[in-house]
């Protein structure tokens, strides 16, 4: 019997959910679909620079699952960029983390104030 599916945790829904090459009508484009969880994995690892173990903990998944999700997301983004495809971010099984960002496993919300000299 397979393990039950764990609900993944994300910090927020992406502000923009669709990207396409400029100057090409939508009707002529192929499309890659990136799940909301895959977008969150990219954000945590590539944008915030978290280690995979930290990012997996924040998303409430195992490190190997995070690694597979990150690989899939990077493949889809690279394919869309290099082959002129549209990229849609939607879908998945997730919950939005309601904790304030300073209580999560990520860097603090605000940068440290500059030191006075």
Curated annotation (Swiss-Prot):
The lineage of its organism: Bacteria, Bacillati, Chloroflexota, Dehalococcoidia, Dehalococcoidales. This is UPF0251 protein cbdbA217. It comes from the Bacteria. Pfam families: DUF134 (PF02001). Belongs to the UPF0251 family. It comes from Dehalococcoides mccartyi (strain CBDB1). PANTHER family: PTHR37478, UPF0251 PROTEIN TK0562 (PTHR37478:SF2).
